[in-house]
UniProtKB/Swiss-Prot annotation:
GO terms for molecular function: adenyl-nucleotide exchange factor activity; protein homodimerization activity; protein-folding chaperone binding; unfolded protein binding. This is Protein GrpE. Residues 1-17 have a biased composition (Basic and acidic residues). GO terms for cellular component: cytoplasm. GO terms for biological process: protein folding. Homodimer. Transmembrane segments: none annotated. Keywords: Chaperone, Cytoplasm, Stress response. Residues 1-33 are annotated as: Disordered. Belongs to the GrpE family. Participates actively in the response to hyperosmotic and heat shock by preventing the aggregation of stress-denatured proteins, in association with DnaK and GrpE. It is the nucleotide exchange factor for DnaK and may function as a thermosensor. Unfolded proteins bind initially to DnaJ; upon interaction with the DnaJ-bound protein, DnaK hydrolyzes its bound ATP, resulting in the formation of a stable complex. GrpE releases ADP from DnaK; ATP binding to DnaK triggers the release of the substrate protein, thus completing the reaction cycle. The gene is grpE. The keyword Transcription regulation does not apply. The keyword Chaperone applies.
C-alpha cells in the first residue's frame, strides 16, 4: 500500500513539473535558448580577449624587466667612462713629462674622485684603516701579531681595502691584526 502511495506521489510530481516547464517546441523556449547561447558565445569571446590581453601584458612586463636589467647599470658605466678618460689623460701626461710625482698625483686625484662620486651617487664606501678596531663582519684577519698594551684587537696593516654598498659588505678588508699577548 505504501508503495502505491509513493508511485502516485511520484506521478503527481512529474505532472507538476510538466505543467511548469514550457513546451520545448514553444517559441518562448526557443528564444530563451537562443539568448542563452548568444550570451555564452559573448562570454567565451570576452574570456578569450581577456586571456590574450593578459598574455600580452605578461610579455610586455617580461620585456620591460629585461630592459631594466639590461640598462640598470647605465649611469655607473657613464661614471666609469669619465674616470677612464681621466686615467687616460694622466697616463698621456706622464708619457710627455716622464715625471713620476705628477703621475702619482694624477692617479691619486682620480682615486679620490672615483671614491667621492661613488659615495655620493651610489653609497659605496671604502673601509679598513690601520688603528681601527677589528670587526670580523667587515675585516678578514690574514695574519695576527701579539702586542703589549692592546685592549681590543685592532688593525695594524691593511693588505686590501674593504667596500660596502648601502651598508652591506661587498668585500671584506684583508688585514693584519694586533691583539693582546694574554
Amino acid at each position: 500500500m505504501e508503495e502505491k502511495k509513493r508511485c502516485e506521489e511520484s506521478e503527481k510530481i512529474k505532472e507538476q513539473e510538466n505543467e511548469t516547464l514550457p513546451n520545448e517546441d514553444s517559441p518562448s523556449m526557443g528564444k530563451k535558448v537562443a539568448e542563452l547561447e548568444n550570451e555564452i558565445s559573448n562570454l567565451k569571446d570576452l574570456y578569450l580577449r581577456k586571456q590574450a590581453e593578459f598574455e600580452n601584458f605578461r610579455k610586455r612586463l617580461e620585456k620591460d624587466k629585461e630592459n631594466f636589467i639590461k640598462f640598470a647599470n647605465e649611469n655607473i658605466m657613464k661614471d666609469i667612462i669619465n674616470f677612464l678618460d681621466n686615467l687616460e689623460r694622466a697616463i698621456d701626461s706622464s708619457k710627455q713629462s716622464k715625471d713620476f710625482d705628477t703621475l702619482l698625483s694624477g692617479i691619486s686625484m682620480i682615486e679620490s674622485e672615483v671614491l667621492s662620486s661613488f659615495d655620493k651617487k651610489y653609497n659605496l664606501k671604502k673601509f679598513g684603516k690601520p688603528g681601527e678596531d677589528f670587526d670580523p663582519s667587515q675585516h678578514e684577519a690574514i695574519s695576527i701579531e701579539e702586542k703589549e698594551g692592546v685592549k681590543t684587537p685592532e688593525i695594524v696593516e691593511v693588505y686590501q681595502k674593504g667596500y660596502c654598498y648601502n651598508n652591506r659588505v661587498l668585500r671584506t678588508a684583508k688585514v693584519k691584526v694586533a691583539q693582546s699577548k694574554n
